[in-house]
């Protein structure tokens, strides 16, 4: 994918969510909510501080993250694939293996 986010923005590919309940029932509609986990596929250079220096981001390409899927998260289709563009501040946690 040929995309480079600016500043503190990251590109996230949403992870597929399980669409079956523990009992094997297929979930649909609002019960099959979108996942708030994804993989970082691109990162910007970092936060621009007051004196013009750049503070690198805490996340890196390949990290699995949990994010806030609300206001400020932009969904885009790039190369026929849906990705999310968000600020690093929209990321709540990094899932460690």
Curated annotation (Swiss-Prot):
What InterPro entries does this protein map onto? Chaperonin_GroES (IPR020818), Chaperonin_GroES_sf (IPR037124), Chaprnonin_Cpn10_CS (IPR018369), GroES-like_sf (IPR011032)
Keyword Zinc (UniProt): no
Keyword Secreted among record annotations: no
> What GO annotations for molecular function exist for this entry?
ATP binding; metal ion binding; protein folding chaperone; protein-folding chaperone binding; unfolded protein binding
Superkingdom = Bacteria
- Could you mention a single GO BP entry for this protein? chaperone cofactor-dependent protein refolding
Keywords, sorted A to Z: Chaperone, Cytoplasm
What is a single Pfam family found in this protein's UniProt entry?
Cpn10
Principal subcellular localisation of the protein:
cytoplasm
Of the GO CC terms on this record, one is: cytoplasm
**What HAMAP family is this protein classified in?**
CH10
Q: Which PANTHER family match?
A: 10 KDA HEAT SHOCK PROTEIN, CO-CHAPERONIN GROES
Q: How does it assemble?
A: Heptamer of 7 subunits arranged in a ring. Interacts with the chaperonin GroEL.
What the protein does comes down to: Together with the chaperonin GroEL, plays an essential role in assisting protein folding. The GroEL-GroES system forms a nano-cage that allows encapsulation of the non-native substrate proteins and provides a physical environment optimized to promote and accelerate protein folding. GroES binds to the apical surface of the GroEL ring, thereby capping the opening of the GroEL channel.
| Protein name as annotated | Co-chaperonin GroES
- What organism does the record attribute this protein to? Klebsiella aerogenes
Which gene name does the record give?
groES
